[in-house]
C-alpha cells in the first residue's frame, strides 16, 4: 500500500510541480514569506537595554524584503507590516495562501546566560512534527491541509501515509535551506556554536512549505542587542539570507546582487 501511495503522491505532486513551474516562469520570481515574530500585545523578548524583539524583527524584515525584491528574483510577502498581533496559525495560513516557496520566521532570542550570543537557524524536528501532523489531519479540512492535493476521498491510512511522505520531504528541504543559510551567516556575522538546531515551533509546521526560524541573535547579550539595532547588521543578515536563497534555488548560478 505504501508503494502504491508513494506512486500516487509522485503523480499528483508532479502535476502540482508542473503547475507551479509554469507559474514561476510567468512571475520569474520565487515567493518568500517573511514572518516578523510577535507584535502588538506580544512584545517577545526584551533586551537588557530595553530593546523589544517585536520591533527589531519588524525592522529587519523590512530591510530583508527590500534587498530581496531589488534582485528581481524574489517576491516577498510579510505576515505583518506593523506592530500588530498575528496568531501563529494565521501566519502559516498567510504563507499557504501566498503559495510560498519558502517561509522564514524572524526572532531574537533571550536566555538567562548573558554571555551566550550569535545567530541560530531552527528547523522542525521529526519527533515534534509527527504528532502535530496527526492532530492537524484530525482538525483541519483535508483538502486545505496540503495545497494542491485533495485527500477528502482517501482512507485514513492513505491520508496518514501521504501526510508523512509530504512532511518528510518538506523537512528535508527545510534542512537543506537551513544549511545554505548557516553557511552564509558564518562568513558574515557571529553565529551560535551550534548554528542549526531542531525544535517544534508552531510556525514551522506547514506540511508543504519548507520553513526556517532565524534567531538573529540574543537580546540577553548586550553586544548582540547593540548589533541588532544597527542597519549594517540587519543588511548583513539580509545578504546572508539572499545568498542562502540563491544557493537553494539557483545553485551554480552567479549574480551581481
Language-model-derived ranges and their functions:
Residues 4-158, 167-179, 239:
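Catalytic-core regions of hydrolytic enzymes
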Residues 162-257:
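Active-site-adjacent mobile loop/cap segments within catalytic or ligand-binding domains
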Amino acid at each position: 500500500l505504501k508503494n502504491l501511495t508513494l506512486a500516487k503522491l509522485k503523480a499528483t505532486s508532479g502535476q502540482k510541480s508542473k503547475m507551479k513551474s509554469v507559474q514561476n516562469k510567468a512571475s520569474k520570481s520565487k515567493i518568500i514569506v517573511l514572518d516578523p515574530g510577535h507584535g502588538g500585545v506580544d512584545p517577545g523578548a526584551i533586551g537588557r537595554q530595553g530593546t523589544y524583539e517585536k520591533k527589531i524583527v519588524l525592522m529587519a524584515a523590512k530591510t530583508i524584503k527590500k534587498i530581496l525584491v531589488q534582485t528581481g528574483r524574489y517576491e516577498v510577502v510579510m505576515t505583518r507590516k506593523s506592530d500588530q498581533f498575528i496568531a501563529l496559525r494565521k501566519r502559516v495560513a498567510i504563507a499557504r495562501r501566498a503559495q510560498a516557496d519558502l517561509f522564514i520566521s524572524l526572532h531574537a532570542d533571550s536566555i538567562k546566560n548573558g554571555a551566550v550570543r550569535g545567530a541560530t537557524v531552527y528547523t522542525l524536528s521529526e519527533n515534534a512534527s509527527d504528532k502535530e501532523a496527526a492532530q492537524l489531519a484530525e482538525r483541519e479540512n483535508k483538502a486545505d491541509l496540503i495545497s494542491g492535493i485533495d485527500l477528502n476521498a482517501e482512507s485514513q491510512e492513505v491520508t496518514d501515509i501521504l501526510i508523512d511522505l509530504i512532511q518528510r520531504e518538506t523537512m528535508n528541504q527545510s534542512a537543506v535551506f537551513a544549511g545554505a543559510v548557516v553557511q552564509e551567516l558564518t562568513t558574515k556575522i557571529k553565529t551560535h556554536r551550534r548554528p542549526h538546531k531542531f525544535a517544534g515551533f508552531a510556525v514551522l509546521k506547514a506540511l508543504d512549505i519548507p520553513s526556517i526560524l532565524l534567531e538573529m541573535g540574543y537580546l540577553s547579550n548586550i553586544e548582540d542587542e547593540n548589533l541588532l539595532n544597527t542597519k549594517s547588521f540587519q543588511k548583513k543578515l539580509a545578504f546572508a539570507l539572499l545568498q542562502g536563497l540563491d544557493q537553494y534555488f539557483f545553485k551554480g548560478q552567479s549574480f551581481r546582487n
